[in-house]
Amino acid sequence: MVAELTALRDQIDEVDKALLNLLAKRLELVAEVGEVKSRFGLPIYVPEREASMLASRRAEAEALGVPPDLIEDVLRRVMRESYSSENDKGFKTLCPSLRPVVIVGGGGQMGRLFEKMLTLSGYQVRILEQHDWDRAADIVADAGMVIVSVPIHVTEQVIGKLPPLPKDCILVDLASVKNGPLQAMLVAHDGPVLGLHPMFGPDSGSLAKQVVVWCDGRKPEAYQWFLEQIQVWGARLHRISAVEHDQNMAFIQALRHFATFAYGLHLAEENVQLEQLLALSSPIYRLELAMVGRLFAQDPQLYADIIMSSERNLALIKRYYKRFGEAIELLEQGDKQAFIDSFRKVEHWFGDYAQRFQSESRVLLRQANDNRQ
């Protein structure tokens, strides 16, 4: 029996080696694709091509008796690696005549990411940090674009301190709140103004499929090429007004981050044994715990800035606190029917999204369980 099992495992090892060779060949082809895309200014990520390819492979897998979900999982991971590989090949310069780009706060993580992407796209990039302010006027004197990438709590102050910029210079900010910085830029500069909010962390290996929110400030025709450049990097663009952006971010960022902070604080005050929690956890709780831990591995100043960026955020968090208290009253009263009625009400509000989110989360939970050690 042992000999038979060993022989079968040896065959599996040979198949795995063949898979490795095929993956290496695929990455070589991806590198060639990256060079062609770079030459012609084509975006890294083309959703129609990806969807068509996955649909074809799923059908072919089913015909071979291979679970379609398996080949999709494998291909999605391979494509993620492919997008990163294409990144390294550089990108077409969509605005060759652009004068130097100055990134204010370019030493920070997001600033470094934009420096990398702009450099890969053939633009000259300069960095303006705190210790450079005595030379700021010289650094920005001939700038074609100035990108402000500094902590939220000093963004408007830094914008106000900028020396006069060339009239055609594009002034951009990357803050995760938009209305205040956008208004500050419109006051500080008479030329083109653009507000951006990258909806991802600076540790992303690629901008493929990442969302970049943009808010029009002034003279969109002057910065249209830059939006197209970001699309070439693989990102999805979403336009919204600065006011609407901040209203949505109150839910997406401020409330979510505060709830995560409060839960982490509660765990610490209760002094629970994390190792035991992990050992006993279901995939969904492990994933939730990972999201909580991830928050506390990052810069507390950033999250304090996001959560405390407006009175509206505080008002929203207070309403959440009030509803939390109302939910606790149901428990105190032991009113299961009221709980079920509230549950059904929320289920109805989610509508078809509930089933969609269940399907999406199922994939995430399987991946989380696969990574369990």
Curated annotation (Swiss-Prot):
GO BP annotations of the record are: chorismate metabolic process; L-phenylalanine biosynthetic process; tyrosine biosynthetic process
Involved pathway(s) = Amino-acid biosynthesis; L-tyrosine biosynthesis; (4-hydroxyphenyl)pyruvate from prephenate (NAD(+) route): step 1/1; Metabolic intermediate biosynthesis; prephenate biosynthesis; prephenate from chorismate: step 1/1
Pfam families tied to this protein: CM_2, PDH_C, PDH_N
What residues does the Chorismate mutase domain cover? 1-90
Q: What is its EC number?
A: 5.4.99.5, 1.3.1.12
What InterPro entries does the entry give?
6-PGluconate_DH-like_C_sf, Chor_mut/prephenate_DH_T, Chorismate_II_sf, CM_dom_sf, CM_II_prokaryot, CM_T, NAD(P)-bd_dom_sf, PDH_C
User: What's a single GO MF annotation on this record?
Assistant: NAD+ binding
UniProt keyword list: Amino-acid biosynthesis, Aromatic amino acid biosynthesis, Cytoplasm, Isomerase, Multifunctional enzyme, NAD, Oxidoreductase, Tyrosine biosynthesis
User: What SUPFAM superfamilies does the record tag this protein with?
Assistant: 6-phosphogluconate dehydrogenase C-terminal domain-like (SSF48179), Chorismate mutase II (SSF48600), NAD(P)-binding Rossmann-fold domains (SSF51735)
Record GO cellular component, one term = cytoplasm
Subcellular location, principal: cytoplasm
The domain of life is Bacteria
Q: What's its catalytic activity?
A: chorismate = prephenate; prephenate + NAD(+) = 3-(4-hydroxyphenyl)pyruvate + CO2 + NADH
* Location in the cell: Cytoplasm
Q: What is this protein called?
A: T-protein
